[in-house]
Amino acid sequence: VNGYPSRDVICQDIARGDAWLVTGDNGDAVGYFVFRPGPDPTYRHIYHGAWLNDAPYHVIHRIAGRPHVHGIFDAVMRHCQAAQTDLRIDTHRDNHIMRHLIAKYAFIYCGIIHTEMGDERLAYQLAATP
């Protein structure tokens, strides 16, 4: 969206081994996301709430997909839930589609975090075990 993530950011994700592709039935890349173990520096401070626990976690960032391709978030979640760890994710307040998808998978709203650029994001956590 608006040039983010940039090519440089994607190259850094790949170099760290954190980048994942979602492929369609024909093998074409239809989506992209980052999945990596925490701690994530932007999740160190949370405001107007608290994380569910201090358990080890993985973060999901930069979910992007081709327009009009459905099921990308479902594929991301199949991959991430296989890690059997707590998951943390954040999104912009105005990203209603992502907020709906996050709620669909029973993530719990935990509070507000700020990105490295200082932008506010809604932060969520899904505990691996209740």
Regions found by a protein language model. Give the residues of each.
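Short, P/G- and charge-enriched loop/turn segments at secondary-structure junctions
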Residues: 7-9, 45-52, 110-111
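Conserved beta-hairpin
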Residues: 16-35
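Conserved GNAT-fold acetyl-CoA-binding loop/helix
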Residues: 1-11
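Active-site beta-strand termini and strand-to-loop segments that position acidic
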Residues: 23-25, 125-129
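Conserved catalytic-core motifs of GNAT/GCN5-like acyltransferases
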Residues: 90, 106-122
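Conserved acetyl-CoA-binding loop-helix of GNAT-fold acetyltransferases
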Residues: 65-82, 99-104
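Conserved acyl-donor/pantetheine-binding loop and adjacent beta-alpha core of acyl/acetyltransferases
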Residues: 34-68
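Conserved GNAT acetyl-CoA-binding A-motif
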Residues: 59, 82-94
